[in-house]
From Swiss-Prot:
Subunit structure of this chain's protein: May form heterododecamers with RVB1. Component of the SWR1 chromatin remodeling complex, the INO80 chromatin remodeling complex, and of the R2TP complex.
Gene3D superfamilies documented for this protein: 1.10.8.60, P-loop containing nucleotide triphosphate hydrolases, RuvB-like helicase, domain II
Name of this protein: RuvB-like helicase 2
Cited Pfam families: TIP49, TIP49_C
Lineage, uppermost ranks: Eukaryota, Fungi, Dikarya, Ascomycota, Saccharomycotina
Length: 476
């Protein structure tokens, strides 16, 4: 994704492109074929074949509507693609299925209680497709006549509109005249008018006017003149989440809170009434419930009260699929004194189906770094890519991925568009990975403030520097 920003140092105020590249912006799906078999490298996903195959089964069940109120735990070491798996699932589901991503630490807030924050996250992940029949007037504009008063008072007008089979003249009031003026509707445009709201939508320009000698923009779209009756009934489907309905009904002008984010605590009575109404709409065929996915990253950060709430919420009538990710092994459950696998209570683990991820091999790391370099528009020499791959295997994939953009800046400093081995080595020396940083702190721990607030102030100013070439040879 790129946006245009102005350069403050440029007196001419020229615009430059700013690329917004996230850690998982290169992922467009799970990389599966029609039989749910994972490809080695596809749609930005590399390796983790068993985990992607399992996620593909979950994807198919979600699309068929045969799974809801289930808990899925993705467990594995750091930098093994757990969040990437969730993002791939989100992209594969498409826009029609709600997908809400939060982290475990987001639940704790001074404004909202833990249960309220979780409830809102749950209800954001449940979509409601509401069907509505509307009457539309669709046709090609033949002529627009607008009579304006000299004193600037009431305006009157006539709109002549036609299809291939009929032609009609409509009287226009102030609101319709303003709408036509706002949309810049001219003779030859194909428009759609919602009779209930008076909303005017410009569909395009008629093919009959395509040969007219007239100035038009590059985005002008030519469409066929509509056939049949002018007035048509059309079924429109609106997709909203349960949380949006909650906010709108929780207070006067509640829809404004959707934009400000100041939702506050929503009373349970409001939610009960909405649940009853949605159930009625479902029985009458007016609405369809779409169970979505709630992804909780770093789920081990939740405490025992949150886990207890999730256990109960999974059994609710309106429950989404909960996907959780953690990199913990046997660790203490927050809010308790006992240890459990992945830092989760055993009763929640019993309710979950668990997907495991494993460390990437060298070839997979190389493929991922190649994809990241393409996403960041960085040209790597083969030797530099091999060195980054080796660094990723010895340190971590995240560290090696971060070195790509740093090494690019070093290469640009010497006026080169290609990142060479020397650029990667300089970046490696400038920025420590976690293991070298830990060793540096251990060797100089007397100079840091400890738990008791004690520190040894050195007057010589000498500190042990981290070893430069422990993971690679940095000599040029």
């Amino acid at each position: 994704m790129s946006i245009q920003t102005s350069d403050p140092n440029d007196p001419n105020g020229s615009l430059k492109s700013l690329s917004l590249i996230a850690a998982h912006s290169h992922i467009t799906g799970l990389g599966l074929d029609d039989n749910l078999q994972p490809r080695a490298s596809s749609e930005g996903m590399v390796g983790q074949l068993q985990a992607r195959r399992a996620a593909g089964v979950i994807l198919r069940m979600i699309q068929n509507g045969s799974i809801a109120g289930r808990a899925i735990l993705v467990a594995g070491p750091p930098s093994t693609g757990k969040t990437a798996l969730a993002m791939g699932l989100s992209q594969s589901l498409g826009k029609d299925v709600p997908f809400t991503a939060i982290t475990g630490s987001e639940i704790f807030s001074l404004e909202l209680s833990k249960t309220e924050a979780l409830t809102q996250a749950f209800r954001k992940s449940i979509g409601i497709k509401i069907k509505e029949e509307t009457e539309l007037i669709e046709g090609e504009v033949v002529e627009i006549q607008i009579d304006r008063s000299i004193t600037g008072g009431h305006k009157q007008g006539k709109l002549t509109i036609k299809t291939t089979d009929m032609e009609t003249i409509y009287e226009l009031g102030n609101k319709m005249i303003d709408g036509l003026t706002k949309e810049k509707v001219l003779a030859g445009d194909v428009i759609s008018i919602d009779k209930a709201s008076g909303k005017i939508t410009k569909l395009g320009r008629s093919f009959a006017r395509s040969r007219d000698y007239d100035a038009m923009g590059y985005d002008t779209k030519f469409v066929q003149c509509p056939e049949g009756e002018l007035q048509k009934r059309k079924t429109v489907v609106h997709t909203v989440s349960l949380h949006e309905i909650d906010v709108i009904n929780s207070r006067t002008q509640g829809f404004l809170a959707l934009f400000t984010g100041d939702t506050g605590e929503i009373r349970s009575e409001v939610r009960d009434q909405i649940n009853t109404k949605v159930a009625e709409w479902k029985e009458e065929g007016k609405a369809e419930i779409v169970p979505g996915v709630l992804f909780i990253d770093e789920v081990h950060m939740l405490d025992i009260e949150c886990f207890s709430f999730i256990n109960r919420a999974l059994e609710d009538e309106f429950a989404p699929i909960i996907m959780m990710a953690t990199n913990r092994g046997i660790s203490k459950t927050r809010g308790t004194n006992y240890k459990s696998p992945h830092g989760l209570p055993l009763d929640l683990l019993d309710r979950s189906i668990i997907i495991t991820t494993s460390n990437y091999n060298e070839e997979e790391i190389k493929t991922i770094l190649t994809i990241r370099a393409q996403e960041e528009e960085v040209e790597l020499s083969p030797d530099a890519l091999d060195l980054l791959t080796k660094t990723g295997g010895e340190t971590s994939l995240r560290y090696s991925s971060n070195l790509i953009s740093v090494a690019q800046q070093i290469a640009l400093k010497r006026k080169s568009n290609t990142v060479e081995v020397a650029d990667v080595k300089k970046a490696y020396l400038l920025f420590l990975d976690s293991s070298r940083s830990v060793k540096f702190v251990q060797e100089n721990q007397d100079q840091y403030i400890d738990d008791n607030g004690k520190v040894i102030i050195s007057t010589s100013g000498e500190m042990t520097q981290p070893a430069d070439g422990e993971a690679m040879d940095t000599t040029e």
